[in-house]
């Protein structure tokens, strides 16, 4: 009987020991911090794709700008740059409706809001210098202009509808914008222009004088 009691006591002691060890292990596990969750690879891939897409968009935009500049010669780009600076009346690097209106006013033309909106609507965004070159390039492609003189003529006629330019406005523009002319230089230039009794300059004759085409034709005829 005494032996049986001893066995029971030993059994209980073992069970209590086992329970104690189990509780200790559980407490240890609870005290150990859980490992940080690993980010899902799918989310990372999506972010990478977005970043890659943005980079591609940026490269595409740069390529588009570069291709426009390759259409024109350095001389043409310099001329367009000067024209852009003349048109950018508020000097913010962007040509808006008020800038276009001022450009038309400077050559004696009146453009209504509908016409100005139509011109601005041709651009895919704000008209900065690159966008202006793009518009001119598209206009040149449509008109079939290919050499330097034809590009200059087509660009000049963009702001001319009836073949005449107001002499006073043109004089003011020459003396106040771009490479500013002195009064004597303007007077000398006007002496060579075809100007009617209403002080209107013949655009075609002016273009011939600027490009030298009239002189070339006279030499060929001789």
UniProtKB/Swiss-Prot annotation:
Chain sites annotated for binding Ca(2+): 88, 90, 92, 99
GO BP annotation list: flight; locomotion; muscle system process; myofibril assembly; post-embryonic development
A Pfam family hit: EF-hand_6
Keywords: Acetylation, Calcium, Metal-binding, Motor protein, Muscle protein, Myosin, Phosphoprotein, Repeat
Stretches that traverse the bilayer: none
Domain (EF-hand): residue spans on this chain: 75-110, 147-180, 181-216
Additional comment: This chain binds calcium. MLC2 has at least two isoforms in each type of muscle and the isoforms of tubular muscle differ slightly from those of fibrillar muscle. These isoforms may arise through post-translational modifications.
Protein name: Myosin regulatory light chain 2
Gene: Mlc2
């Amino acid at each position: 009987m005494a032996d049986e009691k001893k066995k029971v006591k030993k059994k209980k002691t073992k069970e209590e020991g086992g329970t104690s060890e189990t509780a200790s292990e559980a407490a240890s596990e609870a005290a150990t911090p859980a490992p940080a969750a690993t980010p899902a690879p799918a989310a990372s891939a999506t972010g990478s794709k977005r970043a890659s897409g943005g980079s591609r968009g940026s490269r595409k935009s740069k390529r588009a700008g570069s291709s426009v500049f390759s259409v024109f010669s350095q001389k043409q780009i310099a001329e367009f740059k000067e024209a852009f600076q003349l048109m950018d009346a508020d000097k913010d690097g962007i040509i808006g409706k008020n800038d276009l209106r001022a450009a038309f006013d400077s050559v004696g033309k009146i453009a209504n809001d509908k016409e100005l909106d139509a011109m601005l609507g041709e651009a895919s965004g704000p008209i900065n210098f690159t966008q202006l070159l793009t518009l001119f390039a598209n206009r040149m492609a449509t008109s079939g202009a290919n050499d330097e003189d034809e590009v200059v003529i087509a660009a000049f006629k963009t702001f001319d509808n009836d073949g005449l330019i107001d002499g006073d406005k043109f004089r003011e523009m020459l003396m106040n914008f771009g490479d500013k002319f002195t009064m004597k230089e303007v007077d000398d230039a006007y002496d060579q222009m075809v100007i009617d009794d209403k002080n209107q300059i013949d655009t075609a004759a002016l273009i011939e004088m600027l490009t030298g085409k009239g002189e070339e034709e006279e030499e060929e005829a001789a």
